Amino acid sequence: MKTFALILADGQASRMGGEDKGLALLGGKALIDHVIDRVRPQVSHIAISTNRNLEEYARRSPHIFPDARQWQHFGPLSALCTAANDLQLATADWLLVVPCDMPYLPDDLVARFETVSKRTPLCNAYYVETPITMHYNIMYIRPQILQSAIPYLFSGMKTLRSWLQQQRARPVRFEFDGHFADLNTQTDLQEG
């Protein structure tokens, strides 16, 4: 089974003072590098969605793309709508979508998603659930469903949660919430 990763690094990072969150340092290393180190052993290809510092991100993966102009400023859905037209991503069996600000993702993230997907073969989308919350921005999806994000966004809807509900996505339970800590502020980075 061929699984690709799409790392979302295209947010405005308003809680980070506008600093490019993916390039913010945690322990002397960029957040996105922590995420790449966690997902690289689990996938066969990594793409990065980013709207700035394209050259810097290209050092990490040759497969980078900014949000298409018509989708900019709609959050993670912008990246999904743009990815819907990416021919290379379309060749994957599954697409792991993760944000660039979660440096502690579990080493068995894809394996857990794969196990559940084999038990529920008619389901095309999954997301992370922990004892504390749902993490809709961590998805395991069939690339074919990305096309549905376009009319969803055109309809005025903007949340990942509602889009995933439309896809009849199922949660996959992870017991340790710490793996999914997102570092959104400079204080988070200092405490991280």
Curated annotation (Swiss-Prot):
It holds the Pfam family NTP_transf_3. The keyword Metal-binding applies. Gene3D superfamilies: Spore Coat Polysaccharide Biosynthesis Protein SpsA, Chain A. Disulfide bonds: none annotated. One of its GO terms (biological process) is bis(molybdopterin guanine dinucleotide)molybdenum biosynthetic process. It is found in: Cytoplasm. GO terms for molecular function: GTP binding; metal ion binding; molybdenum cofactor guanylyltransferase activity. Its EC number is 2.7.7.77. InterPro entries: MobA-like_NTP_Trfase, Molybde_CF_guanTrfase, Nucleotide-diphossugar_trans. GTP binds at K21, D67, D101. CDD domains: MobA. Its cofactor is Mg(2+). Transfers a GMP moiety from GTP to Mo-molybdopterin (Mo-MPT) cofactor (Moco or molybdenum cofactor) to form Mo-molybdopterin guanine dinucleotide (Mo-MGD) cofactor. The N-terminal domain determines nucleotide recognition and specific binding, while the C-terminal domain determines the specific binding to the target protein. Monomer. This is Molybdenum cofactor guanylyltransferase. It comes from Neisseria meningitidis serogroup A / serotype 4A (strain DSM 15465 / Z2491).
